[in-house]
Design a protein with these regions (language model features):
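Hydrophobic anchor at the start of a short beta-strand
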Residues: 133, 248, 323, 497, ...
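Beta1-alpha1 glycine-rich phosphate/pyrophosphate-binding loop at the start
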Residues: 472, 476-539, 650-690, 740, ...
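A Rossmann-like FAD-binding core segment of flavoenzymes
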Residues: 431, 523-570, 589, 593-598, ...
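Glycine-rich dinucleotide-binding loop and its adjacent helix/turn
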Residues: 565-669, 756-768
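Asp/Glu-rich intrinsically disordered low-complexity tracts
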Residues: 21-24, 29-34, 411, 416, ...
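Flavin-dependent oxidoreductase catalytic cores
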Residues: 1-425, 429-432, 444-445, 449-453, ...
Length: 796
């Protein structure tokens, strides 16, 4: 059922999303900050709100975490927020708590009445690091759920929610009075717990916004004739409740992407200007009941997509209130460029700090290259579904698990020391953080300053691989995400690590995934893992063959061994008529477009290619990829693959991003493509990342035929035999070649030769990058616990 609900959520997001992506694509590239307006603030400059000073202008915004105990905040929340405070965040807004018991939108949604203790602990944990902490407060109204409360939903009018299909009761004076009182009581509780203020939610899923919008409010009373009346009443009650000297912030949806009746940017400008005198901070967001996925979309929506909207709202409020930019702000240089351009006064970098809780500290230390990148995949940080997954990050398994996953030595430095630019100090952070001298993000040329001493002091030359040396403490076989993370963690603990990778470039599945449209950011994570491993002194040997005899020799020398050899394809159909999907994505083949039939050309003898690009057509050129063979595995360079002329069938029994990406790539190369799935919609699992509806729109626009509710039975004689999953009726479609996007098998040759050897990632069971990095991390930690007595923990 949850998949159906999330699919519906994505479907409702179709309205207006195409225009959103088109408009966002017009935002100038903000890769390098420019000089901007005279006097523009720096991202690391302090900012004063309601008399309280935050150490910088980077916000860690409110989001669902599933870290709660019942409806109360837990010790896991405290550790989660404390890590971001220690990492330098200027302003932290806690997970939005319901202000009234009528609102229970998801099972572990906090209830403000149960949050006093949790807020108090969070405030105490974050205060020593200088961060200001606000309580997120809200009510989801008709966009909530009655599943947990067993009570009717509240709404301004009888608008049926597009996702739940529930119709709310129309709020009358008693419900409105209870709502206002609930906001006031929750705010008073937050203030009493020692928080610096509150943020009220009038965003895409909020009851306050529902009163603002002609889509959801058709009232004839004063709350309809003046759509801001309820918000004004709430603001006045909350201001009285928190008293003077505390921050009152508002998260305001300024474009519902439904111009026929919803809030438009022009209307929002008037609303913001009217509310600004009552506010200390205004965060500009986008989305509504038909476009919830526009709030925090995946990488198919360009970063900084709200910059134009924030700039318009900031102009409308004319300095009456500081404005925060939200919307896939994942790069500090781009955030600084937005401040330079006058688009905002602060930047909310929530997912960027889920990926790297020390983002600000690394900026202050002058090491932006060490920031773990957010790749905007939404795979594990988008957690609102009935499985109740705990928030985490595919790149940082410790995120969300701070109470159970100890920091590796390489990441365990105190934020206070980093703020002062001293990466060797382990001195505890203290209240003086906010008073530390501000280290500029960039030099006068607008480029980041690198920390050259890092590589030199860690013996970078030794990390280049090559010559023989003493036996390493750890030998890792496989340079995909699991192997690189294991190497990084083990080396960070002071171990001498050798990593052997059979292909020409490390990165494995991340490199292959980066070939998919709008998935280029995956390569940034591969680059980061490799760079961090080399910085920590890992010897990375490429085009290296490791045999079972090599494992025996290493074990005899006392070397710990970790296998991370990846996966291999399954041969389900005639191999003469089928191609493995990763052979295409990895760059083992290249699609071209010409008057002649499109052909696929093999990789060069060194195993590298330019990937799918060059003559590829379409709105987005795929990233270059430098990998071949069974990505992340031991299969070596791929054999030459030439796809014959004619229609291509992409078989996707998994329903993940691979099948959609391959179909898009082939269609962009001019091929006639059919995507076969047993599901009622293509890319079913993309519902978890918010890309499901968008993906189906892209496939439709690209001319891909979606053969849904279909099982692939055979491929022969230039056709594929499909069978309807419900009726059993069979039909044939043209098929010159089949691209297999199905489940894979472990590449376990070495493991079977030496059973019991520790292994991580796809060679255990093929899954996703998230599991690969998590298991690699765990084996790196385990190796560190067994490190030789003469090895000491590194402090770099």
């Amino acid at each position: 059922m949850w998949l159906v609900l999330v699919w519906l959520l994505g479907l409702t997001g179709l309205v207006g999303l195409v225009g959103l992506v088109d408009r966002a694509a017009e935002v100038p590239d903000a890769g390098v900050p420019d000089t901007g307006a005279a006097g523009a603030p720096r991202l690391l400059d302090p900012v004063t709100l309601a008399g309280r000073t935050a150490p910088c202008r980077v916000i860690f915004g409110p989001h669902e975490t599933n870290l709660g105990q019942g409806r109360a905040l837990s010790a896991r929340h405290t550790a989660y927020y404390q890590r971001r405070a220690a990492g330098g965040a200027g302003l932290i807004i806690t997970e939005t708590a319901s202000v009234h018991e009528s609102d229970w939108p998801y099972e572990r949604a906090p209830l403000a009445a149960d949050c006093a203790g949790g807020w108090r602990e969070i405030a105490a944990a974050c205060r020593p690091h200088g961060a200001l902490v606000l309580a997120g407060l809200g009510h989801t109204g008709l966009q909530g759920s009655s599943a947990y409360s067993q009570s009717v939903l509240w709404g301004p009018s009888g608008f049926t929610d597009a996702v739940s299909r529930e119709t709310p009761m129309i709020m009358e004076e008693p419900e409105i009075a209870a709502l206002v009182a609930g906001f006031a009581a929750a705010a008073a509780t937050a203030a009493g717990a020692g928080l610096d203020g509150v943020e009220l939610d009038a965003g895409p899923g909020a009851l306050l916004r529902q009163f603002h919008s002609g889509l959801t409010s058709q009232r004839a009373d004063r709350y309809g004739t003046d759509r801001l009346a309820l918000t004004r009443d709430v603001l006045a009650a909350v201001r009285t409740a928190i008293g003077p000297g505390r921050i009152l912030a508002l998260r305001l949806s300024c474009d519902e992407l439904a111009p026929w009746a919803g809030v438009t940017p022009e209307q929002a400008a008037d609303q913001a200007a009217a509310l600004a005198p009552d506010l200390d901070l205004l965060t500009v967001v986008r989305g509504g009941p038909y476009s919830a996925s526009a709030y925090r979309p995946d990488a198919h929506t360009p970063p900084m997509f709200n910059q134009d909207l924030a700039a318009a709202i900031r102009a409308a409020v004319a300095g009456a209130v500081p404005v925060a930019l939200q919307g896939s702000v994942v790069d500090a240089a781009a955030a600084q460029a937005a401040l330079d351009a006058g688009a905002a006064d602060l930047a909310e970098m929530t997912r960027a700090q889920i990926a790297d809780g020390e983002l600000v500290a690394k900026l202050r230390a002058g090491t932006p290259d060490r920031i773990r990148p957010c790749i905007l995949c939404n795979q594990t940080c988008r957690v609102r579904d009935n499985r109740n997954p705990v928030i985490t990050c595919i790149a940082d398994p410790r995120s969300g698990h701070e109470t159970t996953d100890p920091p590796p030595a390489a990441d365990a430095l105190a934020a206070g020391a980093r703020a002062a630019g001293d990466l060797t100090s382990a001195a505890p952070a203290g209240p003086a953080l906010a008073a530390q001298p501000i280290t500029p993000i960039s030099d006068q040329n607008g480029t980041y300053r690198s920390d050259q001493e890092e590589a030199e002091e860690r013996g970078q030359a030794g990390a280049e691989g090559g010559g023989p040396g003493p036996a390493p403490d750890v030998l890792i076989v496989g340079g995909g995400p699991a192997g690189l993370e294991a190497a990084r963690v083990a080396a960070g603990a002071g171990l001498v690590v050798r990593l052997a990778e059979r292909s020409a470039v490390p990165g494995g599945t991340l490199r292959a995934a980066a070939a998919g449209p709008a998935r280029e950011r995956m390569a940034a994570l591969a680059d980061w893992l490799e760079a961090e491993a080399r910085r920590l002194g890992v010897q990375i040997d490429l085009l290296a063959e490791i045999t079972a005899d090599d494992l025996d020799a290493a074990a005899e020398a006392g070397t710990q061994i970790i296998l991370a050899t990846g996966s291999r394809p399954v041969t389900r159909f005639d191999p003469a008529l089928s191609v493995d999907a990763l052979a295409i994505l990895s760059g083992a083949a290249r699609a071209t477009v010409a008057t002649a039939p499109a052909q696929f050309h093999a990789a060069g003898p060194d195993g590298t290619t330019a990937g799918l690009g060059g003559d590829a057509v379409g709105p987005r050129a795929p990233a270059q990829v430098h990998a071949a063979g069974a990505v992340g595995g031991p299969s070596g360079p791929a054999e030459a693959v030439t796809l014959p002329d004619g229609p291509v069938v992409v078989h996707d029994p998994v329903g993940g991003p691979i099948g959609v990406a391959v179909a898009e790539l082939l269609a962009a190369a001019g091929r006639q493509v059919s995507l076969v799935s047993q599901d009622p919609v293509a890319g079913t699992l993309l519902s978890l990342t918010g890309d499901l509806a968008d993906a189906n729109v892209r496939l439709q626009r690209a001319g891909v035929t979606r053969e849904l509710r279909s099982l692939l039975r055979e491929v022969s004689d230039g056709t594929a035999l499909l069978e309807d999953v419900w009726t059993g009726a069979q039909r044939r479609v043209g098929c010159a070649v089949l691209v297999d996007c199905g489940h894979r098998l472990p590449a376990e040759t070495l493991y079977l030769a030496r059973p019991g050897t520790p292994r991580a990632g796809d060679c255990v069971a093929p899954r996703t990058v998230a599991e690969a990095i998590r298991e690699g991390r765990r084996l790196g930690q385990a190796a560190a616990q067994r490190r030789p007595a003469d090895r000491t923990l590194l402090t770099r």
